Swiss-Prot record:
Binding site for S-adenosyl-L-methionine: N28, L30, G55, E77, D103, N123
The keyword Methyltransferase appears for this protein: yes
One of the record's GO cellular component terms: cytosol
Cellular localization per UniProt: Cytoplasm
Name of the protein in its database record: Ribosomal RNA small subunit methyltransferase A
Transmembrane feature ranges: none
GO molecular function, one term: RNA binding
Lineage: Bacteria, Pseudomonadati, Pseudomonadota, Alphaproteobacteria, Hyphomicrobiales
Organism whose genome encodes this protein: Methylobacterium radiotolerans (strain ATCC 27329 / DSM 1819 / JCM 2831 / NBRC 15690 / NCIMB 10815 / 0-1)
Amino acid sequence: MSAGDGLPPLREVVARHGLEPKKALGQNFLYDLNLTGRIARAAGPLAGVTVVEVGPGPGGLTRALLAEGAARVVAIERDPRALPALAEIAAHYPGRLEVVDADALAFDPRPLVGDAPARIVANLPYNVGTALLTGWLDGEAWPPWWDQAVLMFQREVAERIVAGPEERADYGRLGVLCGWRTEAEILFDVSPSAFVPPPKVTSSVVRLVPRAQPLPCRAGALEAVTRAAFGQRRKMLRQSLKALTPAAGDLLAAAGLSETARAEEIPVAGFVDLANRWDAHRKAGAPVGTPA
């Protein structure tokens, strides 16, 4: 397939630079520039926007983002084999592509983004996608540095991101954290045949838009409560929350929740209430029923 941006076809780039995907890095490359273009367009108009991309590999999505008009792309890549291929793209789009040789799990892109409008668009490596997302949702400061994220995950992870109590099998800590701070939706699925090598499962592209004003809650408190609650999801909350406090029953009563309730039955607002009450309870002298 010839590319419409004047750069060589991706298969040729991969062959020339010896970029066969590595399973250890969670790499599955997209060669179809029509598909990468669709992903880039899902992030909306990109004029004037800085896009942060994780795991660009040979640069198929990178090229699509630049072709769709992104003012600047910050591409974070830990595989040194990909750097020469990305350098070729940077030369083709002078001043618009900054390649960072780093592990995205340990790298903070905010100093490079600055005050410019920013989005995250990425075909995330399967082995670190969830960890990256929870990191972007973390922190007490909100709204975050990004105004939208368009991300590729395994379908089962995507379903967990958008799940609520009505989808009990998929609903968990990830769904609570995403539902608390973002509006999340699955945009479309991507067949395994679109990737090289083809994974064993279908993938999905998810869009997350930060809520301007999430329900007030300390992020660390919500993380602690959901970790305890879903860590033993089949147990009643009065048992699973004892990992946090011996007063779990009083905490549930103060929140108006049944002691026999299980984590998968509690909506996001219920977990926020629990987290606020637990946060108050852990402060010296604060009664269980007092919100933080």
